[in-house]
Design a protein with these regions (language model features):
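Alpha-helix-loop-beta-strand connector modules within alpha/beta enzyme cores
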Residues: 1-5, 50-72, 123-143
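Catalytic cores of alpha/beta
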Residues: 14-23, 80-98
Length: 232
């Protein structure tokens, strides 16, 4: 049996609709919050673009999904780089984890002809920090309150000893496409969305396992040098 995941439109749904989808065999339910804060949501997905979508309604349906689908079977899409701080988006990631869900993260990449095509793509240093921090919160037991942030809301300390952080960075999984859990490992998404949020020349979410040269580039973008091994 092939697992079925739902990307919903909460604006047109009531709680019973969520139950019907579960009863029909859906396995995972997701909501495209996209924006990390109510203000950004309203500006980019709600009244600011003459849309009926509302932050309150999206969260209402997301909470219905938590009740009906259960732990680890619901989540939310989040786009990084729409004007939020790193602290704000990672606080949202933590909120989802505390509810029992997951975040499926995208790097903002302006599409020609869209209402936001004049905005810059998310800087790679910002994206890599959020990618790494999100992975630590979702899969490594680190909490956002274990991390430190500077006055601009940027991650300055990931809340892990350098050696442990190096191991996670070198594994590369934190920088792969995030989404519904895959067949072989919970932290490797079943959905790889090749180049869905970046050009192939500057990969944001790797649809494949990053190799050594990719990890070196990621480290440069993070500005985190690998700790030299301690001699015995």
């Amino acid at each position: 049996r092939i697992p079925i995941s739902i990307l919903s439109n909460p604006t047109t749904m009531i709680r019973n609709d969520v139950q019907v989808l579960k009863d029909l065999g859906a396995d995972i339910f997701t909501v495209a919050l996209d924006a990390a804060t109510p203000t950004l949501f309203d500006r980019t997905r709600g009244k600011g673009v003459n849309s009926p979508h509302s932050w309150k309604k999206y969260w209402e349906v997301l909470n219905d999904a938590r009740d009906i689908f259960g732990n680890q079977k619901f989540g939310a899409h989040i786009i990084v780089g729409m004007g939020e701080t790193e602290y704000e988006v990672l606080t949202l990631v933590q909120q989802l984890v505390d509810l029992g869900g997951h975040s499926h993260m995208f790097c903002f990449f302006p599409e020609k002809g869209s209402l936001m095509d004049h905005l810059p793509a998310t800087p790679r240093d910002q994206w890599r920090r959020v990618q790494l921090a999100r992975y630590l919160i979702d899969y490594a037991g680190v909490r956002v309150d274990h991390m430190r942030f500077d006055e601009e809301g940027r991650v300055s300390d990931f809340g892990l000893p350098q050696g442990e952080l190096d191991t996670i960075i070198d594994a590369g999984i934190a920088f792969r496409t995030s989404g519904c859990p895959g067949k072989f490992a919970e932290d490797i998404s079943a959905c790889d969305r090749p180049y869905g949020d970046s050009p192939p020349s500057d990969v944001a979410s790797f649809p494949f396992q990053p190799i050594k040269k990719d990890i070196k580039r990621i480290r440069r973008q993070l500005n985190i040098r690998k700790r030299a091994p301690v001699e015995a």
